[in-house]
Regions:
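An N-terminally biased module of ancient metal coordination in phosphate/nucleic-acid-related enzymes
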Residues: 1-67
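Active-site gating/metal-coordination segments in enzymes
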Residues: 60-126
Length: 126
């Protein structure tokens, strides 16, 4: 069985993606249904959703939305790599909430859009 570990879904009617305005070629919806049709055709059996750098206020909604899709009959969604902002003051509480959710398999902080000081600082070492 093939496992796709890096699926991005975009639903602009449900979540905000500020960065899409600067990338016209990607500024459209990418649905699970379209993905599933193609993935099954080539033998993908399971998939992990990789966060899509939604607006910070939508981070938990993105995880919940993908988890909801995973409950559909025949869904290949096995988990989510959730977005995170370790530099935010409420990160510890966010992390505890997400760690309680078995659907969350890991975390990613998009770094190419923030100053290097963030990834080189203590917050990423601690």
């Amino acid at each position: 069985m093939i496992i796709d570990t890096h699926l991005h879904l975009i639903d602009r009617s449900a979540l905000r993606y500020p960065w899409l305005a600067g990338v016209p070629a990607l500024n459209r919806d990418f649905s699970y249904e379209d993905y599933a049709t193609e993935a099954q055709r080539v033998g993908v059996g399971r998939v992990l959703h990789m966060e899509v750098d939604v607006d910070a206020a939508d981070i938990e909604a993105e995880t919940a939305r993908v988890e909801g899709l995973s409950r559909q009959s025949g869904s290949m969604l096995a988990g989510v790599i959730a977005s995170c902002r370790p530099e935010e003051g409420d990160f510890a509480a966010y992390l505890e909430r997400q760690r309680a959710n078995p659907f969350v398999k890991g975390f990613r902080r998009v770094l190419h859009v923030v100053p290097d000081d963030l990834s080189e600082g203590a917050v990423f070492r601690d």
